Amino acid sequence: HYPLRRQRQMCIRDRMVSLCAYETVSQGYSDFCKLFTKKDFEEFSYENDLKFQTVFGFMSTGGKAMGLGWVQEFLHRLKKEPMKGPWTTQNKKLDEDETYFPIDQPIYADFTHDAVIQTILTTLNMRQVADELSGFHMDENRKYRTSRVVPFGARLVFEVMDCDGTDYIRVKMNDAVVPLDENQGCERRPNGLCQLDSYIKHLEDHAYHDSNYDFLCTLKLNENFDLTKLLEGGILSNDDLKALSKSPYKHHSRMEHIRRAM
């Protein structure tokens, strides 16, 4: 028998810890949970936090781009306008058909995965629930925790309400109000509300632009969404390189990948 490499050991351990969680949700109890210590669970939790922030969150080069399609649809629902683009990751055929993409409903419900919710939060610039996490040591005082942001049955709710003739929007994450602030183009308020006009304008000005969607389409990513090389015909100017190096939501090793590819 050959000894398992550390990477393989971590993979098996992670799957078994995950089985503990899934079986507990399904059956109410799991014997797999007895195999692990409190430290094991804490490390597993941090590994998930790091994965979600570096692949789908603000530490990811493509985090905002991955959530852009839904946010564009959300923006058109808020404005009650048919989808006209710019087209990114949406289903254009369905979104152009008001039967499948109505804009006059009092309530909308979308169902998706935890990773998609995280990319949506990133595109919406919800830095209130984000962190710059270390890949070398566990930060026990971090504010971002996957188990709190996108747990089983996570819910992200947007409420539009009329207060004294002015429309406001409020965000609730898993039943807790997340106060909107300057990261969403809003004036800070004790009740967490934001004027709808200000919120819409900020999305119009920043969601597509800040995602770097067109720019990222010239790059090739690996399974972890790390930039590895340019697509055939892709060109990066010096200005592009400078812009990417200043990106607040990139991996710190990305520039090395790109320069090596060029």
Please give the residue ranges for each predicted region.
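Single conserved hydrophobic/aromatic residue that forms the stacking wall/gate
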Residues: H1-R8, I12
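Active-site-adjacent bridging/hinge elements
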Residues: D31-F52, P82, P86-Q90
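Acidic, low-complexity terminal tails and accessory targeting/binding regions
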Residues: V55-F58, K64-P106, A115-M262
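A generic hydrophobic-helix recognition signal that picks specific residues
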Residues: Y2, P106-Y108
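Short, hydrophobic/proline-enriched secondary-structure or compact coil segments at domain edges
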Residues: R5-R6, M16-A21, R170-V171
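Long, low-complexity, polar/charged, intrinsically disordered or flexibly structured peripheral segments
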Residues: R13-F36, D40
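Alpha-helical interaction elements in eukaryotic regulators
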Residues: G28, T37-D40, N48, G67-W70, ...
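Short beta-strand scaffold positions
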Residues: F111-T112
